[in-house]
Amino acid sequence: MMKKFIALIGFVAIFSACNVAQQLYGAYNMTQCKFDFKSISGLTVDGINLSNVNSISALNPLTLAKLVAAFSSSSGSLPLNFTLNLNVSNPNPQQALLNGLSYILEIDDVQMTTGTIEQQIEVAGNGSSVLPLTLGFDAKKVSSGQSLESLKNLIFNFAGIGSNPSNVTFRIKPNFTIGGNTFSVPSYIPVTFTLHK
């Protein structure tokens, strides 16, 4: 009986060591992955759905009226929520693992929002996967001091119907769980792209 117990403990120890090694390899492989902008989906402005809008003229009168009211409101708040989809490419032959990330979103050199997301992703060796990140910020608050036209253009750029492009930098710092402990890479990885028509 004791021999069986010792054998079981030995098996668990070996399995745990292998699991930690797998987590280490997965974390390292993720640091070698390439992150690229893919798309923005699920865009809402003050609760108004702007997904799949091809042009301002394509908006129905009711939606347009709601947008005008939201822009003109003196409440000082204009929540913008969306899903940022990143393409993650793994150049390694082994799987890459991610347990979460910290992020900083900057648009035209202005910081819009920061945060931490606990979201697991696995990318197969020599493969790619889409990492969907749910984000949001108060467009009026972060655009304080700018003109109404600048605010409109920022929001319409997210919908792909803006008149002037917005330069976006999304900085990410991947987090990994190894042996029950959480670690992160020492510096942020920048993902840059432009929002326009």
Question: Positions of the model-derived regions?
Answer:
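Positively charged n-region of N-terminal signal peptides that target proteins for export
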Residues: 1-5
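Sec-dependent N-terminal signal peptides
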Residues: 7-11
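C-terminal motif of bacterial Sec signal peptides marking the signal peptidase cleavage site
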Residues: 14-17
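Extracellular/lumenal and peripheral-membrane lipid-interaction modules
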Residues: 19-197
